[in-house]
Amino acid sequence: MHEAQIRVAIAGAGGRMGRQLIQAAMAMEGVQLGAALEREGSSLLGSDAGELAGVGKSGVTVQSSLEAVKDDFDVFIDFTRPEGTLTHLAFCRQHGKGMVIGTTGFDDAGKQAIREASQEIAIVFAANFSVGVNVMLKLLEKAAKVMGDYSDIEIIEAHHRHKVDAPSGTALAMGEAIAGALDKDLKDCAVYSREGYTGERVAGTIGFATVRAGDIVGEHTAMFADIGERVEITHKASSRMTFANGALRSALWLKTKKNGLFDMRDVLGLDVL
């Protein structure tokens, strides 16, 4: 048994991502699984979290009450849905718990609530916790500065049939990285759908295309297309474990932070590159 530097609680323990997070927490050096949460009324309540995730007994029982486990964790990891995450955010803010938030689909009010909470607690909030995706975001900034003013920029993303928001949070983060490098606001230049007679492509826009099919874990491509050539920067995920490991790495990184809003690029130190 390794010595724990940080104790984590996992939201949505019975979901696809929740189970991966439990596996990662039980395997990662310096991390202790302190609590696992599911919604009230779930048939999984009372289960052993490790057995639920297929990695053996953990001694942590799946519960529905954050109040009941508030003394069992330091950082709360949440990859659920916006409404649930905001409820958890209020609890963590009240009790001084750090958060790692991988939930996507927040509206402006939800994002503002996260910003306000970060004045009191430490939060890592990222659209994607993969190391590769965050390296890609840095590459996109550099490509945009060189090619963005004369290229047609399109972002194509594909996910499994069960994903409920579109475009993905990662695709939006890609768009924001590109727009920011061009001194633009993504809200002013994004094109999210094309149908019927659209006319010619408007220069300076960033287009988005979405695929939902099968069990695709996550694929993202940014295209910089000019006459005669194009550059494509692509990331493909083959396992959710890459996201889970990134989230646990973020939780460890938060142990020295009292408050503030960070993203995965802060965790990886990419902003110094």
From Swiss-Prot:
Subcellular location: Cytoplasm
Gene Ontology BP term (one): lysine biosynthetic process via diaminopimelate
Pathway per the UniProt entry: Amino-acid biosynthesis; L-lysine biosynthesis via DAP pathway; (S)-tetrahydrodipicolinate from L-aspartate: step 4/4
Active site: H159 (proton donor/acceptor), K163 (proton donor)
Binding site for NAD(+): G12, A13, G14, G15, R16, M17, E38, G102, T103, T104, A126, A127, N128, F129
Residues engaged in binding (S)-2,3,4,5-tetrahydrodipicolinate: H160, G169, T170
GO terms for MF: 4-hydroxy-tetrahydrodipicolinate reductase; NAD binding; NADP binding; oxidoreductase activity, acting on CH or CH2 groups, NAD or NADP as acceptor
Pfam families registered for this protein in UniProt: DapB_C, DapB_N
Record key words, sorted: Amino-acid biosynthesis, Cytoplasm, Diaminopimelate biosynthesis, Lysine biosynthesis, NAD, NADP, Oxidoreductase
Any one GO cellular component localisation term in the record: cytosol
Family statement: Belongs to the DapB family.
Protein name as annotated: 4-hydroxy-tetrahydrodipicolinate reductase
Organism name: Salmonella paratyphi C (strain RKS4594)
